[in-house]
C-alpha cells in the first residue's frame, strides 16, 4: 500500500496534550493530583511495611492486601509523574518507546488490580462460607500460585496490545489528547485499519466484566451464608469483615464504569470530562485503598498505631538522654 511522504511507520515521539479545554487550569489541577499521589505512596508503603514487620498479619487476606498495595503503587507511578510534568512544566513530549512502556504498565497494573480484587473476593468467600477449612484451602502455596496467576494473566492480555500498536503505521498527526498513553488513544492516530485493535479493546473490557461477575457471584454466596447465621452479632461481624473489600471494589470499578459509559454513549459530553474520568479511574483507587483498609481493618489500624507509638517512645527516650547529659 502506498503511503504519503510525511508518513512515519514508527514516529520518534508523541505529544500529550493533558486535558484539552482546561489548559489554563493545568497548573492548579496538578496540585490535587500531586496530593493524591503522595497519599497513595505513603499509604500503600505503610501497609506493605506493616504487613512485612508484623508476623500476625502473615495471613492470606493480608498477602492479597500487599498485592493490592503493590499494584496501586505501580498504577499511580505509571501515570501521575508524567501527568504532573505536563501540568506544571509543559513536558508534553514523550518518545515512542516510552509511550509504549507507559501503556504497557498502565494496562498491566489495571488488569492485575482487577484480578487481585477477584482473589480477595475468593478469600472472603472461603472465610465466610467455609471458615473451618479456610487454612486448609488457602495455604501459602495456593496464595503464591494465585499471585503468579495474577501476574501471568495480565501479561498474556497486555503483550498483544503492544504488538498490535507496533504493527500500525502512524501518519502526520502525533498528538494524543490525553494525559497518558493508552491503547485506543494510540490506535486512533494510525492511518491503517484498527479493526483488530477495537476487537482487542472489547475483549479487554469483557475480561473486566468477567471479573466483576465473579466478584458479584462470590458476594451473593457470601450474603446468603451471612443471613443464615443464627445471631445478629455474628451477621454484623461477618458483614464488617467484607466491608473494606466492598468499598475497594466500588472505588476501582465505579470510575471505570462511568469512564466507559461516557466514552461509548456520551457523544455530547465534553472531551475534558472523558479525560478527567479516565484519570479518576487510574489515580483514585491507589489513594483510597490504603485509607479504607487503614480505617476499617482493625489489625492494620492497631499495627500502625503500635509503630507510631514505638517511634514516639524512642524519640522521647532520646530527648530525655540528651537533656540529662
Swiss-Prot record:
Q: Which GO terms describe its molecular function?
A: G protein-coupled receptor activity; olfactory receptor activity
Q: Where in the cell is it found?
A: Cell membrane
Which residues face the membrane's Cytoplasmic side? 49-56, 123-141, 219-238, 296-325
Record keyword Transmembrane present = yes
| A Gene Ontology term for the protein's cellular component | plasma membrane
Membrane topology qualifier: Multi-pass membrane protein
Coiled-coil stretches = none
Which PROSITE patterns does its entry note?
Answer: G_PROTEIN_RECEP_F1_2 (PS50262)
Keyword set includes RNA-binding: no
Q: Which residues lie on this side of the membrane: Extracellular?
A: 1-27, 78-101, 163-198, 260-274
Keyword field: Cell membrane, Disulfide bond, G-protein coupled receptor, Glycoprotein, Membrane, Olfaction, Receptor, Sensory transduction, Transducer, Transmembrane, Transmembrane helix
Transmembrane feature ranges: 28-48, 57-77, 102-122, 142-162, 199-218, 239-259, 275-295
Detail the disulphide connectivity of this chain as listed in its UniProt entry. 99-191
Q: Which InterPro entries match?
A: GPCR_Rhodpsn (IPR000276), GPCR_Rhodpsn_7TM (IPR017452), Olfact_rcpt (IPR000725), OR51/52/56-like (IPR050402)
Residues annotated as glycosylated: 5
Assigned protein family: Belongs to the G-protein coupled receptor 1 family.
Q: What does this protein do?
A: Odorant receptor.
Q: What is this protein called?
A: Olfactory receptor 52E2
Tell me the lineage of the source organism: Eukaryota, Metazoa, Chordata, Craniata, Vertebrata
Q: Which gene encodes it?
A: OR52E2
Amino acid at each position: 500500500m502506498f503511503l504519503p511522504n510525511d508518513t512515519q511507520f514508527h514516529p520518534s515521539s508523541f505529544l500529550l496534550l493533558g486535558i484539552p479545554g482546561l489548559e489554563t487550569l493545568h497548573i492548579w489541577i496538578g496540585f490535587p493530583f500531586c496530593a493524591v499521589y503522595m497519599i497513595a505512596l505513603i499509604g500503600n508503603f505503610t501497609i506493605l511495611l506493616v504487613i512485612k514487620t508484623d508476623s500476625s498479619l502473615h495471613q492470606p487476606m493480608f498477602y492479597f492486601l500487599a498485592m493490592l498495595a503493590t499494584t496501586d503503587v505501580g498504577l499511580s507511578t505509571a501515570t501521575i509523574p508524567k501527568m504532573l510534568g505536563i501540568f506544571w512544566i509543559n513536558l508534553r513530549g514523550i518518545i515512542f518507546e516510552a509511550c509504549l512502556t507507559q501503556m504497557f504498565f498502565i494496562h498491566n497494573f489495571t488488569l492485575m488490580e482487577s484480578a487481585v480484587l477477584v482473589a480477595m473476593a475468593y478469600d472472603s468467600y472461603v472465610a465466610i462460607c467455609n471458615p473451618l477449612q479456610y487454612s486448609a484451602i488457602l495455604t501459602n502455596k495456593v496464595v503464591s500460585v494465585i499471585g503468579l496467576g495474577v501476574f501471568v494473566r495480565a501479561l498474556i492480555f497486555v503483550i498483544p496490545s503492544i504488538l498490535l500498536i507496533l504493527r500500525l503505521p502512524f501518519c502526520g498527526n502525533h498528538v494524543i489528547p490525553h494525559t497518558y498513553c493508552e491503547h485506543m488513544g494510540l490506535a486512533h492516530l494510525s492511518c491503517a485499519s484498527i479493526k483488530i485493535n477495537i476487537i482487542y479493546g472489547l475483549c479487554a473490557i469483557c475480561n473486566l466484566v468477567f471479573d466483576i461477575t465473579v466478584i458479584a457471584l462470590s458476594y451473593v454466596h457470601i450474603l446468603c451464608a451471612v443471613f443464615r447465621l443464627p445471631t445478629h452479632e455474628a451477621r454484623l461481624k461477618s458483614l464488617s469483615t467484607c466491608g473494606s473489600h466492598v468499598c475497594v471494589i466500588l472505588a476501582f470499578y465505579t470510575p471505570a464504569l462511568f469512564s466507559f459509559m461516557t466514552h461509548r454513549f456520551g457523544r455530547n459530553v465534553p472531551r475534558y470530562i472523558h479525560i478527567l474520568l479516565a484519570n479518576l479511574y487510574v489515580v483514585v483507587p491507589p489513594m483510597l485503598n490504603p485509607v479504607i483498609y487503614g480505617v476499617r481493618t482493625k489489625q492494620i489500624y492497631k499495627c500502625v498505631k503500635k509503630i507510631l507509638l514505638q517511634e514516639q517512645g524512642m524519640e522521647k527516650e532520646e530527648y530525655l538522654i540528651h537533656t540529662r547529659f
